[in-house]
Amino acid sequence: MNFENIPEYVNWEDEIPVIQYKALTDTGCVEHGFSTRLGGVSQGIYKSMNLSYTRGDEKGAVDENFRRFCDRLHMDWQKIVSTDQTHTANVRIVTKADEGHGISRPKSFFDIDGQVTDVPGLPLITYHADCVPLFFVDPVKKAIGLTHSGWRGTAARIGRNTVETMQKAYGSRPEDIIAVIGPSVCQNCYEVSEDVARAFMEGFRISDRLVYAKGGGKYQLNLWEANRQIMVDAGIKAEHITVTAWCTACHPDLLWSHRKSGSDRGSLAAFLMLK
């Protein structure tokens, strides 16, 4: 299939579906993708493409899932640098010394929800099952960032922190950065309490598009719009931002969702690597 004019698409090559983005492919300097729940070897509640070692799945199955998915993306799965996600706004500068962190060797850093690097051939990943993956590519300075942004990370503006870390570490200019807000829970599926909604009523441009009051102290929160605002405020051009159309909770046949399945599920992952 020709994806030349499609901003976001599911590439079904080799029966391992990958969600990809024209804007990132067009930079010519990265490999990237977002996994689905299909194309792996895990069984039971993890069937079939589970990419988490922490959910109770067999390690050998998760290893094979990583190998299969990374082969599709022309990445070495044993070099992956994994986050240690605790819903922070912390961003780490990743170097070659971090190769294999959390995948082929034990974790050595913790409480990290975002990563940046300028090292070619070093795959970054973040884990997801409703929270927002944020991709950042600077094709000028040849630097990348990948971030996990749940409501806490979004309220703390981890997307801005990622851009600022790329500026300081690599001299990136925000106006050069190409960004993607990836598959995650949509506003219609994301009901939150008033205390969570309140965190977004201060400091964001408020509209029904961001926080919609449905009554009874419940609100519908749009993390896609919140992160888009954060990116624009950080200096990324609006035309350089692609926003997903894939809601994890709306598509339980294709994507893992904590809102839909609770803890009885696998995990998705976002992948980004400089060529």
Which positions does each model-derived feature cover?
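Active-site microenvironment for binding and transforming phosphate-containing groups
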Residues: 1-275
